């Protein structure tokens, strides 16, 4: 069984670039341990002979038949954008 230690939580905190309080670390240690204990319990379930289920809902996304055709207003739409590069519209990047 995997044991969640303070060192492990500190390592994960560093990897995630978080700054947690001591109370938050203790809470995470408890939560992580509960999650890992539950996964360990699931690993003990006997699934011998059980066929894998890839999706609980069969045929959930029916696709309609396509009718490809050329979009004729392409040049009109491109005129509304300030920049174009290699036949594509160019928009500002999204930055945080």
Swiss-Prot record:
Its EC number is 6.3.5.-. GO terms for biological process: glutaminyl-tRNAGln biosynthesis via transamidation; regulation of translational fidelity; translation. Keywords: ATP-binding, Ligase, Nucleotide-binding, Protein biosynthesis. Gene3D superfamilies: Glu-tRNAGln amidotransferase C subunit, N-terminal domain. GO terms for molecular function: asparaginyl-tRNA synthase (glutamine-hydrolyzing) activity; ATP binding; glutaminyl-tRNA synthase (glutamine-hydrolyzing) activity. SUPFAM superfamilies: Glu-tRNAGln amidotransferase C subunit. It catalyses: L-glutamyl-tRNA(Gln) + L-glutamine + ATP + H2O = L-glutaminyl-tRNA(Gln) + L-glutamate + ADP + phosphate + H(+); L-aspartyl-tRNA(Asn) + L-glutamine + ATP + H2O = L-asparaginyl-tRNA(Asn) + L-glutamate + ADP + phosphate + 2 H(+). It comes from the Bacteria. Heterotrimer of A, B and C subunits. Allows the formation of correctly charged Asn-tRNA(Asn) or Gln-tRNA(Gln) through the transamidation of misacylated Asp-tRNA(Asn) or Glu-tRNA(Gln) in organisms which lack either or both of asparaginyl-tRNA or glutaminyl-tRNA synthetases. The reaction takes place in the presence of glutamine and ATP through an activated phospho-Asp-tRNA(Asn) or phospho-Glu-tRNA(Gln). HAMAP family: GatC (MF_00122). Belongs to the GatC family. NCBIfam families: gatC. This is Glutamyl-tRNA(Gln) amidotransferase subunit C. It comes from Thermotoga maritima (strain ATCC 43589 / DSM 3109 / JCM 10099 / NBRC 100826 / MSB8). The lineage of its organism: Bacteria, Thermotogati, Thermotogota, Thermotogae, Thermotogales.
């Amino acid at each position: 069984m995997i044991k969640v230690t303070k060192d492990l939580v500190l390592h994960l905190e560093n990897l995630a670039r978080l700054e947690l309080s001591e109370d938050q670390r203790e809470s995470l240690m408890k939560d992580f341990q509960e999650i890992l204990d539950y996964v360990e319990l699931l690993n003990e379930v006997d699934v011998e002979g059980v066929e894998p289920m890839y999706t609980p809902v069969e045929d959930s996304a029916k696709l309609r038949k396509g009718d490809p055709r050329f979009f004729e207003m392409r040049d009109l739409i491109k005129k509304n954008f300030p920049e174009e590069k290699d036949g594509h519209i160019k928009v500002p990047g999204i930055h945080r």
